[in-house]
Regions:
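Conserved phosphate/anionic-ligand binding catalytic regions in large, soluble enzymes, centered on
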Residues: 200-208, 263-264, 308-324, 363-373, ...
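Carbohydrate-binding surface patches
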Residues: 491, 501, 515-544
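C-terminal beta-strand-rich structural cap/linker in extracellular carbohydrate-active enzymes
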Residues: 552-570
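Amphipathic alpha-helical
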Residues: 408-423, 489-514
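Active-site cores of enzymes that catalyze phosphoryl transfer or operate on phosphate-rich substrates
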Residues: 35-66, 145-177, 315
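Acidic/aromatic-lined carbohydrate-recognition and catalytic surfaces
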Residues: 1-43, 72, 82-148
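Catalytic and substrate-binding clefts that recognize carbohydrates or anionic sugar/phosphate headgroups
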Residues: 210, 214-332
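Extended, charge-enriched "interface" segments that sit outside catalytic cores
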Residues: 226-235, 243, 309-310, 324-425, ...
Length: 570
């Protein structure tokens, strides 16, 4: 069991949190300057107060039970939520290790090309892998025609980086104005003025990890600050070339992650709708696709540096489930038909209260990827997506008439999109099975999100956090184990069960070995010891069990190959 630990914040509620309630009710007994006291928010949530986990006393008080559970063998390891929100992430992780907690995974968003720091952890929670195995199945040849289509429809020719920067700057100037004011207070006495919102928005990664206590500033931090092109004086403060503003450095580094998250994940990813499968937590929609060679290189690097990294395709925070992203990736396999269908739908629905072109295109893609989606779920998702985009509606000032029109438009559009979505599902399911097999066999620890054993076409929370019918899954698994042939409904469950059985049978093969095989650009194939894996990454490609291997999938027509060497073969 992996225990989820949230060290960064706690509920600031009188009724639910005695650590918060008791000091307030007994304020006269505490030596605290209440008029000037304040708390650090978690993101923009005032009811969640930041915890000073960097203080040894606070760490001991909050982690004694966690360490006890690990020592007693009741917990195998822990997952650290939002490690970037801590004042000193590296120091916190070293304290976990010193407390005897050795298996630690961190929820850390790495930008494409960014590497995890040399921390005492098993790895991240796997968003990088989720984005890689999505991009692997996006056809690079479709980038030009589908980008042209998006620009024609919306009239917006900005690259994603520009959209993201605008959204981050917007959030820094509005949502995080209190945090900016507190940062400014830490600069009291410096005559030079800085545009702190612009500085917070300019960082290309979630944060730097400069430690004022040790004076440690590594090359990655220096490069990140240089890439941000900050004013020289501000850069010198953040790289500790000029000392005396340690509190500012710490708080600045704690503030860039929420600016990035709210600006990119919760705003820009809802504004830039070129191909929605690329709009994922930790992803970069500017990166259109990933080659087989690049996936192999990433797998080899992971095996070398962090072999116990989690591999995810869906989590509680993903914008879309892995299966839905697979269907949307399949849109790149038929760019010509996609253009024709979109133009046809727009003609048919031109007078049905259509929202703006960008929102319209978002609705078409969502219906195609999540079909069949119940209207109630679609309505709830549209409301959230429109408000997160903050263009024509928002959480602070909801545009109820526009939201109603968008929901009505989606309801009418569904009947036109449905036949296309049904055809798309065949290719999408093929991609989803291939992604699932890669997650189960690539270097790392496969992480299965609840309910993902069967097809899951869900969108962001709360949709992806609905109750799971475990009884149904147990019944279907029992039938498969009793010899039932996999159907379309059970194909994914069958693949997962067979792959896990193989991992249990041959643990040594999945510990160290990984040998990429050159099967051309349209097939991803490799061996892990005596295990052979092959998946097609384009519709025209096919794979088969090689000579000298036994089919672990017993000939099931899943479009992928999982095989082990025939022990009778010499």
């Amino acid at each position: 069991m992996i225990l989820d630990v949230v060290p960064n914040h706690m509920a600031a509620s009188d009724d639910e949190n005695p650590f918060w309630r008791d000091p307030l009710r007994r304020a006269k007994f505490f030596d605290v300057e209440w008029r000037t006291g304040g708390v650090r928010r978690f993101f923009d949530i005032g009811d969640l107060a930041g915890v000073r986990i960097e203080d040894p006393e606070v760490f001991e008080a909050t982690h004694a039970k966690v360490a006890e559970l690990v020592r007693e063998g009741l917990v195998d390891g822990i997952r650290v939520d939002h490690v970037d929100g801590l004042a000193a992430p590296a120091r916190y992780l070293r304290r976990l290790r010193d407390a005897g907690i050795e298996r630690v995974w961190v929820e850390k968003i790495l930008e494409p090309g960014e590497q995890l720091r040399e921390w005492p952890v098993c790895g991240t929670t796997g968003y990088e892998f989720a984005n890689e195995v999505t991009a692997l199945f996006v056809d690079p040849a479709a980038e030009e025609p589908l980008t042209e289509l998006y620009r024609e429809l919306t009239g917006d020719e900005r690259p994603f980086g520009e959209v993201a920067l605008d959204a981050k700057l917007e959030q820094a100037r509005t949502t995080f104005e209190p945090e900016v004011d507190r940062l400014q207070a830490h600069l009291h006495g410096i005559e030079e003025t800085f545009d702190l919102p612009a500085a917070l928005a300019s960082l290309h990664v979630y944060r730097t990890y400069v430690d004022p206590d040790t004076g440690e500033v590594d090359g990655l931090d220096r490069q990140a600050i240089a890439d941000a092109r900050l004013p020289p004086r501000l850069a010198s403060l953040l790289t500790l070339e000029e000392r005396g503003r340690d509190a500012f450095v710490i708080r600045f580094q704690q503030t860039t992650p929420p600016v990035m998250a709210k600006g990119v994940e919760d705003t820009a990813l809802h504004r830039y709708n070129r191909l929605l499968c690329l709009n994922e937590v930790g992803g970069d929609p500017a990166r259109w696709s990933l080659s087989v060679d690049d996936l192999h290189a990433g797998n080899l690097e992971r095996l070398r540096r962090i072999p116990n990294q989690l591999l995810a395709t869906s989590t509680h925070d993903t914008k879309r489930s892995g299966d839905m992203r697979a269907r949307l990736a399949a849109l790149s396999w038929l760019p010509g038909e996609r253009r024709e269908q979109v133009q046809r739908w727009r003609r048919l629905l031109a007078h049905d209260g259509a929202p703006d072109a960008n929102e319209e295109y978002f609705i078409f893609q969502t219906l195609a990827g999540a079909w069949p989606i119940e209207q109630e779920r679609m309505d709830a998702y549209l409301e959230k997506a429109l408000r997160e985009a903050k263009v024509n509606s928002g959480w602070l000032e909801p545009n109820d008439p526009l939201e109603r029109r968008a929901k009505d438009f989606a309801r009418r559009a569904a009947e036109h999109v449905a036949p296309f979505a049904d055809r798309l599902s065949t290719a999408g399911d093929r991609i989803a099975l291939a992604q699932t097999l890669l997650k189960l066999t690539c270097p790392g620890v496969p992480d299965a999100y609840q309910g993902d054993e069967l097809w899951s076409l869900t969108v962001v929370d709360p949709d992806n956090r609905a109750p799971v019918d475990w009884a149904r899954r147990r019944r279907l698994l029992a039938e498969l184990r009793a010899g039932a042939k996999p159907t379309r409904e059970t194909a994914k469950l069958f693949l997962i069960s067979r792959a896990l059985e193989l991992r249990r049978r041959r643990p040594e093969a999945f510990a160290n070995a990984y040998e990429p095989l050159d099967m051309g650009p349209h097939v991803c194939a490799f061996t892990r010891g005596e295990t052979y894996v092959a998946v097609p990454v384009r519709p025209e490609a096919s794979v088969e069990v090689p000579q000298g291997y036994c089919d672990v999938l017993d000939g099931a027509a899943l479009g992928v190959v999982l095989a082990e060497r025939d022990r009778g073969t010499t």
